[in-house]
Amino acid sequence: MEQSNFVNMKLSLVPTLLLLLVLLVFYQHHSSPNLNSNALSSFVDATSLAPSPSPSLSMEFSVASSNLSTISSPPENKGNKRNIIEEGLAKSRSAIREAVRLKKFVSDKEETFVPRGAVYRNAFAFHQSHIEMEKKFKVWVYREGETPLVHMGPMNNIYSIEGQFMDEIETGMSPFAANNPEEAHAFLLPVSVANIVHYLYRPLVTYSREQLHKVFLDYVDVVAHKYPYWNRSLGADHFYVSCHDWAPDVSGSNPELMKNLIRVLCNANTSEGFMPQRDVSIPEINIPGGHLGPPRLSRSSGHDRPILAFFAGGSHGYIRRILLQHWKDKDEEVQVHEYLAKNKDYFKLMATARFCLCPSGYEVASPRVVAAINLGCVPVIISDHYALPFSDVLDWTKFTIHVPSKKIPEIKTILKSISWRRYRVLQRRVLQVQRHFVINRPSQPFDMLRMLLHSVWLRRLNLRLP
């Protein structure tokens, strides 16, 4: 009899235990950060700020989802400042939605530049979003670590945007630098991939990423255990910036830990794990010593450009090898050279061409894109898996030509088929987007550094923390 009562008691507990289990799962689901909330698509229609289709990928704007982290669970601490931040972001979403609906912006200061035209996916959404960013966005730079591996990056040559951005945000003069982490919307991991490779891989006797992984993982481990911010969002409001070819490999050190981290990269190769919904594509720019970028030509008509297309560069990667094989020194109109004579000026030749060929090298990005835009030359993107920079807001089909690698033999036919009128429209639009591909120090609204920040801002808008 006693045994029967005991069995009945155990059976009666089963529904209670099941209910507790359901409640536990419900709580865990709602207490984790909402990393898959299509916040942007919910307040702006799909044609506004959603990333563009790249040549090989249709992109939708949503942060990668995640329920688990290899770090400890987020602490239960919903402070007033955090609520204020989330409320401010909600108001920004509403303002952007209204700008799209009413087709006008709202600003509490005079706007010196108003984005308009076909080069923007939705000029009203972009403009209002930029206004909201200028008013609110704050980035906290972790103080841990020492130079040269942390808090310092190259300021010149092709990796320079890494150092320029880090220097801009860390000098204390940037209006986007948070005074304390509690007021920050996003968190910069100021680790320099370029400097890690430069200082720890000399002499270069191995291509193993082990040392790179160790430095980056150690840094994340320190800040994740010292502060609550990484664990709170599972890294989804954290980012790093790098133009080095090895930069995408950082996430390979611990894919589970890094799966929400925003990677701001020049090497935005969708065939190698770049995720436009989460990651940010930035331009590669070659900054010579004593300058902030390549020469700039603000006005030039096609009549001043006798060369149909121009390229000069080494045989780096399979796309360039195909290009040189078909066109090297073979055509007066499509001028393709592996090396230029010493008496030839590279930038002057670009400035006398209507179209500038921008093939991928060993990696997808090329500084020729920025150089071409600054020189008023219509870029011809020759790449198969390149997620183009700032595609959240810029419609690259309106001011560039894309040629997949399989059509390299047809380049002349493709370019000759473009009417004079169509070319002039493309070139005028190239001149229109120049401001977005210029580095200023200090940075200015809508320039390259602000566009980088705006890309991170959009991904933070798309994230709702509990």
From Swiss-Prot:
InterPro entries in the cross-refs: Exostosin, Exostosin_GT47
The residue ranges crossing the membrane are: 6-26
Record-listed E.C. numbers: 2.4.-.-
Establish whether keyword Cell wall biogenesis/degradation is in the entry. Answer: yes
* Cytoplasmic topological domain: 1-5
Q: What is its main location?
A: Golgi
Cellular compartments per GO CC: Golgi membrane
Record keywords, A-Z? Cell wall biogenesis/degradation, Glycoprotein, Glycosyltransferase, Golgi apparatus, Membrane, Signal-anchor, Transferase, Transmembrane, Transmembrane helix
Those parts of the protein on the Lumenal side are 27-466
Q: Which domain of life is it from?
A: Eukaryota
Q: What class of enzyme is it?
A: transferase
Pfam families, alphabetized: Exostosin_GT47
Q: State the annotated membrane topology for this chain.
A: Single-pass type II membrane protein
- What's a BP term from Gene Ontology annotated to this protein? protein glycosylation
Q: Where in the cell is it found?
A: Golgi apparatus membrane
- Entry-listed glycosylation sites: N67, N231, N269
The terms under GO molecular function for this entry are:
glycosyltransferase activity
Q: Tell me its family.
A: Belongs to the glycosyltransferase 47 family.
Annotated function: May be involved in cell wall biosynthesis.
Protein name listed in UniProt: Probable glycosyltransferase At5g20260
Lineage start: Eukaryota, Viridiplantae, Streptophyta, Embryophyta, Tracheophyta
